[in-house]
Amino acid sequence: MSKCDVKQNALCKSLGPEYKIMYIDLERCIYRDFGNGFDVEISGTHTTSNRKTATVYLWYVPEKITVKRVSGVKQSESGKVVDELYQFSQKLLRKGITDRDTLWSIRRTASS
């Protein structure tokens, strides 16, 4: 197991049991399924560097669309960002926003 694997596994474990390592688009990422039709991908954590930032993607699985992207996330803050994205996904569901066109428009305005 490489040093990158060990470090990423430790970060994944620190986030909690609902997180796992997955390969997404040929990249080893940290993944969490919210169980509500949305999931998150934490990209850029397969590194030995503590200074390298991650990008967190919120996906709406039924439509296979990225709803929101948060870039420049400190690895130590990734759990907090995922929690915020979970709340955002719950808000979308409460408002009944699950159609592709509306999610696409949110995606264009919500990415940071």
PLM regions: where:
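Acidic, low-complexity, intrinsically disordered interaction modules
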Residues: 34-66
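Negatively charged, low-complexity tracts enriched in Asp/Glu with abundant Ser/Thr
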Residues: 1-37, 62-83, 87-112
